[in-house]
Amino acid sequence: MDTLLAVRARGITKCFGDVVALDGVDLDVTHGQIHGLVGPNGAGKTTLLGLLLGLAVADSGRLEIQGEPVGRAFAVPDGVAGFVDGPGLYPSLTARQNLAALAALRGQDARTAGVDDVLDQVGLTDVADDRARGFSLGMRQRLGLAAALLTKPRLLVLDEPSNGLDPAGKKQVHGVLTRLAAEGTAVVLSSHRMDDLEALCSEVTILAIGRVVFSGPLSKLAADNRELDYRLVTSGPQSARRLAAGTPGVGVADDEAGRHGAEALVVRA
């Protein structure tokens, strides 16, 4: 097992105009670990995954992959593969042709690159000669995973890999990721599904408004019973108070109505 970290990020900041997508993010991922990124839409998960894949560069902070500092060039770091916002596929090509084209870009033919092997790993052998334009979302996700596996990555980066998967497809993908981790590959994935995180991840990082609010073992998160405060802006504060009062484990910690232009409540849960 490698002793160096697959990913080491310190103080990573990324802005898009006036929008701060990542604000001082730290992240450690070890080899053989499946690390989940969790958070609401707009939390910064996809931006962080894009940095790991070389699709963007941080404005500040330090990012190391496999112990090597990531430079300012837009390039996929060595040993890294994956996708964000869904895999990029050629819709007019078959599944096999898509993978063969990717192999050719790396100077390999389909046989030596192991195209048939990765198709089998993700359960697409029976549709290998079907055009990608007819694939369901789940099939496209699995083909994207197969494309990443062609490179035999040491770090696999996946954005919502379970999207669109039926139970059989999810079992297949989970099996692939678990096996890769057992072989020493680091996997970083985002997911909105707690069942995916519980089934796959040993560590999770929770992002909110571009900041890390928790990072550590999933078991520690499950045992964490700290209360959190949420500031809610509402046009119906009376109804919100009644709803909070009638919900077990939820209460109004502060009433900011009248102190702001909009009615606001701080709800503790």
Task: List the predicted regions and their residue ranges.
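C-terminal coupling/interaction segments
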Residues: 3, 268-269
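Intrinsically disordered, low-complexity segments enriched in small/polar residues
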Residues: 9, 15, 30, 34, ...
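ABC transporter nucleotide-binding domain
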Residues: 174-268
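ABC transporter nucleotide-binding domains
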Residues: 4-7, 14-209, 214
